[in-house]
Amino acid sequence: MMLGAFQSCQLRLEVNASRLAIRESLTHPSQIQDWIFPQQLEPGLPPVLTTGLSYKSQFSGLVITHEVITVNDDCLKLLLSGSVEGFHYWYWGAGWVQSHLEGVSLLPLQLVHSYALFQLRSFLGQMDS
């Protein structure tokens, strides 16, 4: 049984980063953990996300399961379950990143989504420094 409201949010940001730097920040768990705070990824993840991988993240006692549906040079698609029932799609290129999040949740997804993207932009900016 899904609790919460259906929510949908999309953001596209300009970032001062190469396509490769963006890809690595979205597909390497060690880098994801550096910018996704206060959300915590489960320990023991492989160095790079791969299609079919399922992992959990936690935020204030709420657990989200992420299943990697697709990962390639410019796209990451995740199926979400648990505290968010839906999907999260990422697309990127040189100098930009776009995220589309849809799901049913009690969490304020638009706020969480915006905060995460601005953290990512800040992280990528620090990498360039």
Q: What is the predicted role of each segment?
A:
Residues 48-56, 70-79:
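Short, hydrophobic/aromatic-rich segments at coil-to-beta transitions
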Residues 75-129:
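Beta-strand/loop substructures that line and gate deep hydrophobic ligand-binding cavities in soluble
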Residues 1-46:
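Hydrophobic ligand-binding cavity/cleft-lining segments
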Residues 6, 59-61, 83-85:
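Glycine-centered tight beta-turn/hairpin loop motif at sheet-sheet or coil-to-beta transitions
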Residues 16, 58, 69, 79-81, ...:
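A structural detector for beta-sheet-dominated domains
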Residues 21, 56, 65, 77, ...:
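General beta-strand recognition
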Residues 13, 64-70, 86-94:
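Hydrophobic/aromatic beta-strand elements that line small-molecule binding cavities or substrate pockets
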Residues 18, 60-61, 73-74, 93-96:
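Short glycine/proline-enriched coil/turn segments at helix->beta-strand junctions
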